[in-house]
Amino acid sequence: MKRNSANIEWTYGAIPFARNETHDKVIEMMDKEPRGSVLDVPTGTGILAERLRKMGFEVSCCDINSSFFSVPDLKIDIGDLNQSLPYPDHSFDYLVCLEGIEHTENPSNAIREFQRIMKKGGKIFLSTPNFLNIERRIRFLFTGTFSKIPSHEVIKNIWKGDLAMAHLSPLGYPLLKFIMECYGFRILRLEKDRAKPKMVWLLPLVWFIRLYGRFASQKRKEVYRLDETTRDEIILGGNTLIIMGEKGSEG
């Protein structure tokens, strides 16, 4: 299969775990950055890593499970985001974590490890399901959950007991931003994977929520991060939220 993105042509034979639109958006964002060392974790099939390498980045791949990895001329390291990653301090200029943080038992540990192994001023590109778009907020109202809960039969028979396949930590953007800032990251940019045209029917509800935020007290705005959760990239965002951050001097 061939596809053109960021002025390069690449070929692959596997299926990306993250949405194609998420891969394409991250490639577009990273194409504007100076070339350097990048860690792709969890790398999954290695498709994104292959694209980044063809763009001129020095790529390292890491995942808790190597059985899905399908890029023969790239090496994969085994690492668990809930524990210490197998890299020295200050190893990477960039870190890409697509659809991984919500699968961890301890997302704070993962962010702390990212901070440790990245160089000062390094850029992080992190994606996670957008649990706070208006569509998912309505779903939560009726179901009481932001993410589907797998059955024990699925975990046992299909996932072979691997809980890391489930969304163990479905984090909304305010909490994820809070954790990242606690470990010295500064948020630079938010992106969505794609627009969802059917959300136009939910615009009246979005306007009502924004009106509530406008007249809320300053304290309420701050503690609930209302200015952040009502911005277009989140409340009108797609299925996936893409966060670009930078490691500061702290930590």
Stretch-by-stretch model annotation:
Residues 4-6, 97:
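Generic detection of intrinsically disordered/low-complexity segments and helix-coil linkers/edges
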